Amino acid sequence: MDKDQFLMELYEEAYETEISDEQMGKLKEIANEDDSFNRAMVAKILVNSESEEGEEILLKLTHDKDSLVRAEACDSLCIGETMETYERLKKLSEKDRVGLVRGYATISLCDISEGLNMQSDTIKFLESRLDVEKVVFVRINLYTALYKMGKREYLKQLVQLLDVPRYQNRGAVANSLGEILDESNEEEIFKILLEH
């Protein structure tokens, strides 16, 4: 089986079955090869990994020269369980030169902060980022992350970003609202949307 077929099949299977040691070894090999599309696929697949090795591969991919690979790795690191991952995501959410990477690093940082008992630190850090971050996609993810961490006052700012010109950003706002929508806030979200 060639690499492309292996990656596509594993991408479909990984949601339902655990990644085997043999498959993990092959993913590690591909993560070190030249094809950036394949490296990005490795990162996408590893969101389904529950192993330290999967997290280590993703951490390595956050250093990739290709920003799409870094973005996919950051997105998949929502599974992270270590302070090393927390610190790497924190750094990327602030310092990566590409907004897409900063945005995905922000959401994954939020996702792993609870398991590491770092919510208070994360909230302070993310709120400080609001003062300097200009990229709309990153701001969407900052508002979403802060809302998910209990800072409900950021919902209105998130909804206001539905007015931005780029449809990709409006789609990201809609996705974020769908992600945070539940029985406890659906009335409030619908009210804000109707007022908006």
Language model: regions and residue ranges:
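Structural detector for internal amphipathic alpha-helices that build alpha-solenoid repeat scaffolds
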Residues: 2-19, 29, 37-51, 60, ...
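Amphipathic alpha-helical scaffolding segments comprising HEAT/armadillo-like alpha-solenoid repeats
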Residues: 17-32, 51-63, 82-95, 115-131, ...
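Short inter-helical turns and helix N-cap capping residues of alpha-solenoid HEAT/ARM repeat scaffolds
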Residues: 34-35, 65-66, 97-98, 134-135, ...
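Residue-level recognition of hydrophobic positions within alpha-helical transmembrane segments
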Residues: 68-71, 92
